[in-house]
Regions:
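Amphipathic alpha-helical interface surfaces
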Residues: 17, 21-25, 53, 76, ...
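Alpha-helix termini
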Residues: 29-37, 91
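Thiol-based oxidoreductase modules, predominantly thioredoxin-like and allied folds used
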Residues: 37-51
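Non-catalytic, surface beta->alpha helical segment in thiol-disulfide oxidoreductase systems
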Residues: 66-92
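Conserved short-loop catalytic and cofactor-binding motifs
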Residues: 13, 45, 68
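Structural micro-motif
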Residues: 54-64
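Local sequence-structure signature of Cys/Sec-based thiol-disulfide redox active-site neighborhoods
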Residues: 1-31
């Protein structure tokens, strides 16, 4: 079985847009799995725990990264779904 791609989710524990984006991501990934589509492994990273991550992503959270593709300031299900639909097939 091929390895599943890794999706990095950068956020903060005390960030309501991050919580909303996490919930949206979970819903989208469950939907993808139910349709037999590729679902990445998700690594949730809190930028507040690492000064380098805070400098790079602090003003942009929530941020989703797959491979070399980044989606900063994730704000909608449509935006997140389009990002996954565009990036995941390239890694399959």
């Amino acid at each position: 079985m091929p390895l599943r791609p890794v999706l990095l989710f950068y956020g903060r524990a005390s960030c309501s847009p991050c919580t909303e984006a996490r919930d949206s991501l979970q819903w989208i990934l469950e939907d993808r799995a139910s349709r037999g589509e590729l679902v990445p492994v998700v690594r949730d990273l809190d930028v507040a725990t690492d000064p380098d991550l805070e400098r790079r992503y602090g003003a942009l959270v929530p941020v989703v990264v797959i491979g070399d593709a980044e989606l900063p300031l994730v704000t909608s299900v449509r935006q997140l779904r389009a990002f996954l639909d565009a990036t995941l097939p390239l890694l399959a």
